[in-house]
């Protein structure tokens, strides 16, 4: 028996079997390809394989990957067929690589008809390194294929696309109209790099109804050679540009990327207000680099130089973020882009000014097997005229 006051037990995490939730497919995947054709919760951990995982049409699967390496020379290592819904949870470090031309690392498929598409949602605290080949995406479409809905809520995603493809989004030689072909980023750290003639995040060629929505997180989007913009449509040839994104909505987050000049009118917030980028710098470039900060209701991280790439409406003058319990702000984003610590008085708004009662929640999300429908209500909130506190939390009840 142990004497709790004197004895110590050291446990190495590598000596402890991982806790699994749901059906463990690790052994099956080591022995061959795996097909998920039943709704359920699944786990794959600590494997290094050349086999593939396919989630069949109509299946809803919660899949956790933990310290997984998947490489395929014949296919996408992970295939999500059109009409399938996958919640992908990432733990540890995971690497997914396609080496066959025209194949995505993680294939999120859609057909060329209305509302026939797959949905991939990624979250977790781990790392996902995913690479596609030429003419395809890292996460998204194969060659001659539309991409489905891609939602990223968390994790560190390092996505690399092939030549004429995208890191996250479409492949080339596509044609069709799928309303759910959206890319939505709500959180996480996303490093997206495209191959030559490709954009990092977006649709390619003739895919229509594609939208990019950013509500939070940090995005570093790097275009391929011969392309001057990293977010939006790609290029089929060195001389031909093809439209692939209808709208780009930025409601939060830090987005380090560029847009084609004709696409800047498409960059807007959820209310349709046109946006412009402002690059802000935290006051300590060493201590505050690669750190999480809060802006209103969403979170992001600074880059390696402690910079934030935020989007604001025309006429915006001030901006404030919270880091380590302190507020950093500027009152003049045009001329003072380095944030300084706020040292003024606390918030003086009364409860009557800072609270509002709603008859229903401010957002209702209806989940369906082939998509989501969101109904949003907005409420104007004005702080007390004499209050100088830079950030305000609106308490909503219903």
Regions found by a protein language model. Give the residues of each.
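Surface-exposed loop/turn motifs in large extracellular/passenger domains
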Residues: 52-62, 79-98, 105-132, 139-161, ...
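Short Pro-Gly-centered beta-turn/loop motif in secreted/extracellular proteins
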Residues: 305-327, 332-336, 357-359
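Thrombospondin type-1
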Residues: 347-357, 363-398
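Short, acidic Ser/Thr/Gly-rich low-complexity loop/linker segments typical of extracellular
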Residues: 295-309
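A short, amphipathic beta-strand motif
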Residues: 265, 278-291, 325, 342, ...
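N-terminal domain-start segments of secreted/luminal proteins
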Residues: 2-72
